[in-house]
């Protein structure tokens, strides 16, 4: 079988030489060579010598009706066997179908679930949309061309194909970089993120990503580089093979802006994320060390920390490795073609990296979305047929280990004994407040704050903190737990366990659950479904303790009074909240919409917990002081040090940008008839530090962060 000779345009045939006349010399020679070869083929066909000949067509063509195979820049013609076309085409088709399906599921879940519309998730949705459009515009054309072993469309279609691939490829890379930067800031600078990150700003950042990607996808359409066929001649990309200075400059810029810089940023961000998780943030570490009891630093906590570090390292390694494996081959091939090693860039070497690059659309929805519990729950809810394909959540299995961090605090407070309204009763001479926040946010985004209050009440007389125990006295432990689920349901539970005390110490047989306060009471959000109540409803703890202890001692309950310190990071949506009378009102002065960290100090002088006060009352400095003074007058309570303890309430009401954020509430109460200002300050400092620690933990270990 005789092979028809093929022809190849000279390497500089595309160069425009303005100094020559109508046709440059090189172009004239090329046309002459083509004419001679065509004539030779025609003579063989006319003479019958061409029967059974295998045609090796012109390489690199994109014209309609042409049959395109491969060639390298050295003029060597590659006869690509049909099997190679079918293998590559099938691989790209499978990759494209999986990528389109996975990213479509992510986008659909985002549209149907309002709980997913957080600023951080916008980047993930943008990535899914970009990958989906990449597969939609490139995969079908590539698969059909591979089936016919040639480019079936026009030159203009080749340019559009290359433009779509360039635009959405650049957008995906830039979005991956933005996600790594967002996670870096959330982990290392959480309070900065709280102040500056809003939905509007994230949307603006995404718009900039589109514009930036468009800036580098358009130039080849206007003469700076070009979109030409690549590999087996069944796809198109920017021209990195032509030895032209302007083309080389464009390739260099693309290499640095779309590979080198994003890759470097991702490595830097994930390295610092791992370092922060390993060593702990300076502020968080200092706060925990100051308020943590030595007994808390046990092996279990160290084991959780070790698992967190391993998990973070694995995720960082996977993300960086997948990015490098997807885009490094393409970057290497384009660099070889640009640096003058065109003879090494074969059609096979061009096609394989392109296939790797398209595979990024498959793993992105898995790494950044499907592994996140909120997305899985949304998929199970809105696409039930896929429930069996998704891994079970940790709440369902109860066996998987979830990354946890704990911040625990213990503080002993010595309080001043003061006369009370009932002459036969006395206040406690010593009390201990312990707060344990075990992980802040679980994989189901259930926020739990466990508060344990140990109060020692003496039956008669007022003794010092170190006084010997008296017969009939007791120690009560109140355990309160709050769970806030993504659906908006709030579950509160508070149990009182009283242990009688003998002259020789505590009884070995505590009375189990002498009183149960709001046991497992599920409070449906009075607000719009999906919203978490603001502020969080909680069961009054202090007053029931006093009533319970007084009942045990056969004494009338003292008037509830004391100090309550609250640290809140709350969820609001569209800046609206539901008040207690079920009337929808605009939240006035709701400072948490700007994600600023606020502390509120209020005097707890009634049985109604401060958390039930309306936000506009709770976060107003003047209103809080006024309420405190009124409470003091009502209960004949006058302490000059009290005003000193509530001199500031951070409102930060200048930036009231709407947003939707998770809520974490840490609350404890130090009960005393006349709390000295030093006790008040200790309580406030503990709550503030614990709030900061809990907030950082919840941000650091939320699945959107890693």
Curated annotation (Swiss-Prot):
SMART domains in the cross-refs: 7TM_GPCR_Srsx
Record's bilayer topology term: Multi-pass membrane protein
Modified residues (N6-(retinylidene)lysine): 358
This protein's record includes keyword Transmembrane: yes
Positions on the Cytoplasmic side per record topology: 108-121, 181-201, 270-314, 373-706
Region annotated Disordered, chain positions: 393-446, 571-599, 630-658
Tissue: Expressed in Joseph cells and photoreceptor cells of the dorsal ocelli.
Gene Ontology molecular function: any one: G protein-coupled photoreceptor activity
Keywords: Cell membrane, Chromophore, Disulfide bond, G-protein coupled receptor, Glycoprotein, Membrane, Photoreceptor protein, Receptor, Retinal protein, Sensory transduction, Transducer, Transmembrane, Transmembrane helix
Disulfide bonds: 158-236
Residue stretches spanning the membrane: 87-107, 122-142, 160-180, 202-222, 249-269, 315-335, 352-372
Biological process terms in GO annotation: G protein-coupled receptor signaling pathway; phototransduction; visual perception
Biased composition annotated in UniProt, kind: Acidic residues: 645-658
Composition skew (Basic and acidic residues), residue ranges: 571-593
Main location: membrane
Glycosylation sites: 12, 64, 69
Record topological domains on the Extracellular side: 1-86, 143-159, 223-248, 336-351
Short name of one Pfam family: 7tm_1
Job of this protein: Photoreceptor implicated in non-image-forming responses to light. Photoisomerizes covalently bound all-trans retinal back to 11-cis retinal. Most likely coupled to the G(q) signaling cascade.
Annotated family: Belongs to the G-protein coupled receptor 1 family. Opsin subfamily.
Name of the protein this chain belongs to: Melanopsin
The species this protein was found in: Branchiostoma belcheri
């Amino acid at each position: 079988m005789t092979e028809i000779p093929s022809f190849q345009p000279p390497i500089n045939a595309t160069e425009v030489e303005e100094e020559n006349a109508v046709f440059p010399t090189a172009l004239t020679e090329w046309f002459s060579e083509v004419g001679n070869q065509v004539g030779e083929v025609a003579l063989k066909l006319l003479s019958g010598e061409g029967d059974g000949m295998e045609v090796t067509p012109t390489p690199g063509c994109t014209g309609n009706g042409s049959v395109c195979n491969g060639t390298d820049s050295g003029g060597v013609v590659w006869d690509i066997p049909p099997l190679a076309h079918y293998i590559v085409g099938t691989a790209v088709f499978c990759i494209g179908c999986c990528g389109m399906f996975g990213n479509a599921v992510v986008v659909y879940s985002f549209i149907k679930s309002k709980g997913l519309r957080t600023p951080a998730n916008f980047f993930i949705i943008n990535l899914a949309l970009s990958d989906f459009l990449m597969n939609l515009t490139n995969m079908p054309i590539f698969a059909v061309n591979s089936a016919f072993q040639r480019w079936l469309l026009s030159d203009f279609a080749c340019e559009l194909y290359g433009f779509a691939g360039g635009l959405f490829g650049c957008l995906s890379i830039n979005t991956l970089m933005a996600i790594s930067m967002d996670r870096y800031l959330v982990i290392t600078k959480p309070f900065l993120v709280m102040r500056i990150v809003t939905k509007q700003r994230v949307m603006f950042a995404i718009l900039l990503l589109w514009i930036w990607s468009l800036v580098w996808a358009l130039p080849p359409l206007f003469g700076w580089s070009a979109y030409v066929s690549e590999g087996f001649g069944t796809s198109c990309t920017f021209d990195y093979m032509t030895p032209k200075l302007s083309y080389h400059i464009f390739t260099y810029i693309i290499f640095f802006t779309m590979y080198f810089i994003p890759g470097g940023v991702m490595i830097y961000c994930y390295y610092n994320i791992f370092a922060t998780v390993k060593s702990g943030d300076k502020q968080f570490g200092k706060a925990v060390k100051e308020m943590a009891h030595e007994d808390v630093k046990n092996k279990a906590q160290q084991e959780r920390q070790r698992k967190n570090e391993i998990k973070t390292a694995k995720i960082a390694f996977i993300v960086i490795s997948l990015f490098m494996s997807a885009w490094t081959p393409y970057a290497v091939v384009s660099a070889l073609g640009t640096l003058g090693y065109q003879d090494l860039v074969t059609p096979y070497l061009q096609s394989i990296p392109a296939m790797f690059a398209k595979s990024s659309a498959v793993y992105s929805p898995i790494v950044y979305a499907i592994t996140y519990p909120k997305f899985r729950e949304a998929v199970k809810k809105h696409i039930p047929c896929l429930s069996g394909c998704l891994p079970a959540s940790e709440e369902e299995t109860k066996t998987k280990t979830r990354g946890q961090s704990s911040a625990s605090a213990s503080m002993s407070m010595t309080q001043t004994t003061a006369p009370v309204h009932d002459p036969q009763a006395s206040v406690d001479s010593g009390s201990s407040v312990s707060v344990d926040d075990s992980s802040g946010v679980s994989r189901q985004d259930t926020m739990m704050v466990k508060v344990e209050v140990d109060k020692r009440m003496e039956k008669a007389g007022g003794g010092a903190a170190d006084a010997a125990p008296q017969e009939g006295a007791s120690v009560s432990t109140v355990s309160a737990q709050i769970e806030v689920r993504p659906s908006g349901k709030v579950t509160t539970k508070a149990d009182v366990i009283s242990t009688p005390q003998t002259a020789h110490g505590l009884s070995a047989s505590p009375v189990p659950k002498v009183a149960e306060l709001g046991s497992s009471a599920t409070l449906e959000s009075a607000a719009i479904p999906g919203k978490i109540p603001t502020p969080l409803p909680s069961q009054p703890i202090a007053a029931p303790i006093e009533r319970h202890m007084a009942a045990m001692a056969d004494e009338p309950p003292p008037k509830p009074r004391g100090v309550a310190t609250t640290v809140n990071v709350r969820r609001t949506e569209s800046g609206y909240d539901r008040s207690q009378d079920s009337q929808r009102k605009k939240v006035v002065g709701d400072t948490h919409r700007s994600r600023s960290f606020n502390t509120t100090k209020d005097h707890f002088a009634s049985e109604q917990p401060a958390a039930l006060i309306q936000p506009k009352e709770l976060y107003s400095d003047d209103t809080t002081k006024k309420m405190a003074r009124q409470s003091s007058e009502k209960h004949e309570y006058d302490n000059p040090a009290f005003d000193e303890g509530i001199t500031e309430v951070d409102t930060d009401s200048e930036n009231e940008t709407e947003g939707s954020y998770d809520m974490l509430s840490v609350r404890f109460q130090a009960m005393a008839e006349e709390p000295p200002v030093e006790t008040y300050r200790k309580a406030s400092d503990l709550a503030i530090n614990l709030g900061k620690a809990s907030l950082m933990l919840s941000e650091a270990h939320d699945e959107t962060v890693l």
